[in-house]
Swiss-Prot record:
Function: Dual function macrocyclase-peptidase involved in the biosynthesis of the highly toxic amanitin toxin family of macrocycles. Cleaves peptide bonds on the C-terminal side of prolyl residues. The enzyme first removes 10 residues from the N-terminus of a 35-residue substrate. Conformational trapping of the 25 amino-acid peptide forces the enzyme to release this intermediate rather than proceed to macrocyclization. The enzyme rebinds the 25 amino-acid peptide in a different conformation and catalyzes macrocyclization of the N-terminal eight residues.
Gene Ontology MF terms in the entry: oligopeptidase activity; serine-type endopeptidase activity
Biological source species: Amanita bisporigera
Gene (UniProt): POPB
Name used for this protein in its record: Dual function macrocyclase-peptidase POPB
A Pfam family annotated for this UniProt entry: Peptidase_S9
Tissues of expression: Expressed in the pileus (cap) and lamellae where it colocalizes with amanitin.
Amino acid sequence: MPPTPWAPHSYPPTRRSDHVDVYQSASRGEVPVPDPYQWLEENSNEVDEWTTAQTAFTQGYLDKNADRQKLEEKFRASKDYVKFSAPTLLDSGHWYWFYNSGVQSQAVLYRSKKPVLPDFQRGTRKVGEVYFDPNVLSADGTAIMGTCRFSPSGEYFAYAVSHLGVDYFTIYVRPTSSSLSQAPEAEGGDGRLSDGVKWCKFTTITWTKDSKGFLYQRYPARESLVAKDRDKDAMVCYHRVGTTQLEDIIVQQDKENPDWTYGTDASEDGKYIYLVVYKDASKQNLLWVAEFDKDGVKPEIPWRKVINEFGADYHVITNHGSLIYVKTNVNAPQYKVVTIDLSTGEPEIRDFIPEQKDAKLTQVKCVNKGYFVAIYKRNVKDEIYLYSKAGDQLSRLASDFIGVASITNREKQPHSFLTFSGFNTPGTISRYDFTAPDTQRLSILRTTKLNGLNADDFESTQVWYKSKDGTKVPMFIVRHKSTKFDGTAPAIQNGYGGFAITADPFFSPIMLTFMQTYGAILAVPNIRGGGEFGGEWHKAGRRETKGNTFDDFIAAAQFLVKNKYAAPGKVAITGASNGGFLVCGSVVRAPEGTFGAAVSEGGVADLLKFNKFTGGMAWTSEYGNPFIKEDFDFVQALSPVHNVPKDRVLPATLLMTNAGDDRVVPMHSLKFVANLQYNVPQNPHPLLIRVDKSWLGHGFGKTTDKHTKDAADKWSFVAQSLGLEWKTVD
């Protein structure tokens, strides 16, 4: 079909004010910065009316695609297949695992009726019994289960519940003798205890050895779940099962450092409680350790501050007595494993598994009472190795696999489970059994079977291209085997490039369906700012060097066209959250004609205001701080809102945000689209925004129906903006 007709300069009106903010620059002194759309930061009737008008205008454009409903139906069908997690054996003798029959919004927690591992290879038939079904927590599917944890005794199940995807959760507790499979009358589900622990955000649930209570992180109560005020004054509390939250003990809070946040864990033997302390989103934390007190948790936990300077990343793997094993990047950008002896006056730190210079250590688990399984990422492909109790590499596991792997296990048990996935691998779970003969230890436990799609019809390859400064960057390219690399295919280019997060291969039935339907390819460049190659790769794409991230992303699109992987003008870029920032920044930076379309979901766009809202202060380690004069110049230069060009044609652009997004607040998308529409009113391609007022959070936990409808809007926009032809026969 030809691109949907577009009449420039037809947007709903947007008021401009004379608001000006003044910043301090180390090179320029006082810098006045006009902010005519400052009023879009507010929760006001005017903003509500404006977003309603803009969204209705966008919907009018989307409604012109006659294939949109048909595309939504194909997306929904593509998601209808059985999904599952690796199982875990509790001390109670029950196996537990998550299972989704197809299009359930949330996976259901099942358990075995006997201590024997169920036979999961019996087709797609369900095995075991339902223990906890989070889909019945609310009639409309808006109650979402987040983190959850069983007590060491297996007697209790603690689970966090959020509504409409907000980042704040309430933790509930229920006995494992009480299942939930039908719609409840009580908040959090019938059969639970009266405990309700509120205002938890980015929390872990760490049970104490005696199973009498757990540690969690919370914030002070707010007037509203979607208040935009800056997050501060996090605290770690201890909740004793069967008591009210008012009785909870604060075990850690630092009023002098209100931006600090915390994570907790406990050793599997119950000997130690671990506390990690973060000052921002950088890969630097403190590590404090305390021995579990048999008399219970008290307000003044005697923390031993093993690592008490922010300089590197430290995360405990396990302990053998007083010797703890820690994964760290101290003097090792690619990470290594060290041991720390807590029995000495001054903790002794020694290398255990040394750094590999050409591969990043991403995950390490202790297995079978002292062995270790380590996953390395070499050129963005996972490799799995088994190590001895002495730290010697013994063997490589599943050497023929290409993709992403993860480990599920309990270290005292003789079995571990490896989950494999990739662009055309929906999911395979293998079991590694130390009690079996060497050649029979690794076996397939369960394989995902699709309905409608054939994953074998797709293939992926990895290429390397040069960025603007000559740096070589890897990129995955995925296609349906019938799609030719002859310069005629449209391309979907997805990226992230920030916070040391790796853009791993991922399985998406919706993406594969779109590719098959329109003959498109998928490109995923592993740009700087991510974690693909350790700390140096991240450092090369943050703060002052953040421009490299955009250069890498733009160069990827140019490479696709030049080498005939994609057609000129047919590259559509997409990204969410920080990836949305990547999209917005690339739109305003790229030469005219580089992209044909762009979709940003919940993206950061106003870099002069981001750290004033919710958790934004933590991102200053990534973006810089606009209120520090030494940072101001490079932050302003990075900000999409403040760098919209007036002298060139921009690609068709759709910004998607939720009205109550409490992580990346919607003002980012609102102000960016207002500037786009004002600066280039005669742009021959639409510059649109869709504000969802039915969902509050950053995108977490959407129902299957809602996720499918959102995807249909997104990909329908791409198809109609690029003028893509429906190729498959239905």
